[in-house]
Amino acid sequence: MLDKNQLEKYNQEHLYEYEKLMSSNEKNALDEKVDQLNLAEIQDLYQDLYVNRKTIDDVSSVSEVKYEVKSRLNEEERHTYEQKGYEAIRNGEFAVLLMAGGQGTRLGYKGPKGSFEIEGTSLFELQARQLIRLKEETGHTINWYIMTSDINHKDTIEYFKQHKYFNYDANHIHFFKQDNIVALSEEGKLVLNRDGHIMETPNGNGGVFKSLKKAGYLDKMQQDHVKYIFLNNIDNVLVKVLDPLFAGFTVTQSKDITSKTIQPKDSESVGRLVNVDCKDTVLEYSELDTDIANQFNNANIGIHAFKLGFITSAVDRELPYHLAIKQLKQLDENFGVVERPTLKFELFYFDIFRYGTSFVTLQVPREEEFSPLKNKEGKDSVHTATEDLKRMDLI
């Protein structure tokens, strides 16, 4: 039985009323779930991230990151980086980590976003092709770690099976799930999903490293003598997966964190890679005043290489949550299905940067390496992604 006094203390007394409409099994399931939750922490999250939320307007401690521009590298520098990259890949120094926990909902597609196809080629296949090419060029089969979520894990694995893993060695593809966290109403109340369970949503890409560890894959990387983890996400159709030049740049620089960026456009709604108090980090566009965002020259595109030693030392350290507000379907007080603004709490992978001690960035040409697929129509859409893939002769 739910503790009514405890629920009232943390603004969750509506759950007591919900129980009156539930069967015995449903009540037991709700009781068990609520017992597992730290209601005080949930209330603190709500207060800190929603009630008292603010944007960043004091940039006195924020400066530009240390970066090099790819287009300014001479032929000798490019060749040297590429050769070092091929050598490191051949020697098994890199693992590839793909964040692919999302669905294709905003594309008008039911299924894992990575399985969305553009003229017959899925986002997963676009990346698998590049790993196959690296295998042909180096003789080494790179381990490919793919983070899914509860909402797409089974479908993702099934899609890979149906497509015979895109002719990549299935023994070198490793799937694991990110964790979840509860969602709240704008009043700070726990909500029920359409099945009558406490609604939980994926806890953001910042959980990637802990989930990787929980699955045993950080240990595997150490056993495989991996030195660097190349990280990217599923959204960017022009991503160069572990391109040898960037791999060589990473090895040569030998920093905890090596990043790729692009030159941002004014008022572009993309996070900025900046240096805060002598550490690189990403400030989300939603957390910055527009005039402040326009002061910085490196837009984050979610492509990085991390020293494995750094990740293993920092993986268990705490990261802050960030707020996202989404329209999600849920049960109302009469158990009818409604769609309402819902607070999602997300961890961001780049918050682990705060535990690093050395950083470097390579700014790359937007037109060659960045074309996000986010919408069905308009900006960053299926149309723009298709045009960019054709322009780069990728489909």
Swiss-Prot record:
This entry's Gene Ontology molecular function terms read: uridylyltransferase activity
Q: Where does UTP bind?
A: M99, A100, G101, G102, K113, Q178, G204, D235, K344
Instruction: One Pfam family, please name it.
Output: UDPGP
Which UniProt keywords are given for this protein, alphabetically ordered? Nucleotidyltransferase, Transferase
Q: What is its EC number?
A: 2.7.7.-
Top-tier EC class: transferase
Family as reported in the entry's similarity comment? Belongs to the UDPGP type 1 family.
**Name under which the protein is recorded:** Probable uridylyltransferase SERP1770
Please name the taxonomic classification of the source: Bacteria, Bacillati, Bacillota, Bacilli, Bacillales
